[in-house]
Amino acid sequence: MKPVIALVGRPNVGKSTLFNRLTKSRDAIVADFAGLTRDRHYGNGRQGKHEYIVIDTGGFEPDASSGIYREMARQTQQAVAEADVVVFVVDVRGGLSAQDHDIANYLRRLGKPCVLAGNKAEGMQDSMHLAEFYELGLGEVHPVSAAHGQGVRSLVDLALKPLALPEIEEEDAAAEKNVIRLAVAGRPNVGKSTLINTWLGEERLVAFDMPGTTRDAISVPFERNGQKFELIDTAGLRRKGKVFEAIEKFSVVKTLQAIESANVVLLLLDATQGVTDQDAHIAGYILESGRAVVIAVNKWDAVDDYGRQQLERSIETCLSFLKFAPLHFISAKKRQGIGPLWSSIIQAYKSANRKMPTPVLTRLLQEAVQFQSPKRSGMFRPKMRYAHQGGMNPPVIVIHGNSLEHVTDAYKRFLEARFRKEFDLVGTPLRIEMKTSSNPYTDKQNS
């Protein structure tokens, strides 16, 4: 499970600059849910083998009437609660302020791992300006320059150190045991809890909460027709006696983590509300993560024929990038249409892990080129030689040849369609990578 780092601090200390540095670019922002997570942004970061989620909490300016805690509760408190470690950003050039003291007092009371980052410290590593921040009682001040990238790598190492992260291979333990890890993702009140409880009731399971750290999602193991599953909860599933009580509490971090750790994601939509921006955000993250996906539209019984037609068009338009995903229309409350979901989930899992032999891929590639060759780009005509599989979950096909950087997106989609049809790839993204062979005569010509 990816650890979560929250960036906390008063306005204009450089949190957003540090956020963009950690996530490499502004394009790395994966979720910005208006209204729900106002003034908080979520992004992906990576250091070495370890990936992590970063939360930029935005600044806050407490006034005399509201006080620090009310303002913290509105924006920052939720992010801090979701985080495994807090990076408290201060402005070395601006100096220590009363707000810094207020924030430090709050963080100390939480008892959560905290790293103090002295930003804007270009050329001030040994300056007396750093000394005053020791008054905050949060230990050593680590000088960084978010704008120039100085000290950022060591800051991340320090933040991740107390979390005792497992080796990457341990994350794949469930896959080795042929267990399908299934995450049910969706906005609040789309019916995730109802669907989960219906499943558990149908299977008459003795389910249990698996113990884990604060960053672990709750998992419910169960078996259906001989296939083992592990349901990753994003709805706040809790046990009450022998009955599970699901609490719909939307957490962006929990949703992102569940998607990352799943083999298959069931994206649940609400037929009565259509496809919203939040739905599209979640769908986009599923695609970005490379997870297999099945789409289910819940509360299908609550809309008339005209509403159904409008919804189908909305899905085709707003979620066109998931057109490879099986689409189901269900009513979790009335238990209608739920059975066929399992077939699609298993099919998506098998597609994501399908092995594709090199001879077959190369034959399909050659047949595709004979049927329709890639267009010339100026004086360059891409020449494709052979293909092989470069990975699974999601499946990756690597194509080798010359001048492949000139292959158009339209031609890649043409190839994707042919590969999908041959290998019956349903419910999984398919990534096609082009590798241009180096010219062995380049060095001789330049010598």
From Swiss-Prot:
Which residues does the annotation say bind GTP 1? 9-16, 56-60, 119-122
Q: Where is the KH-like domain?
A: 354-438
Which GO biological process annotations does it have? ribosome biogenesis
Q: Where does GTP 2 bind?
A: 186-193, 233-237, 298-301
Q: Name one GO molecular function term.
A: ribosome binding
How does this chain assemble? Associates with the 50S ribosomal subunit.
Function according to Swiss-Prot or TrEMBL: GTPase that plays an essential role in the late steps of ribosome biogenesis.
Family, per entry: Belongs to the TRAFAC class TrmE-Era-EngA-EngB-Septin-like GTPase superfamily. EngA (Der) GTPase family.
Q: What is the official name of this protein in its record?
A: GTPase Der
- Specify the species: Acidovorax sp. (strain JS42)
Gene expressing this chain: der
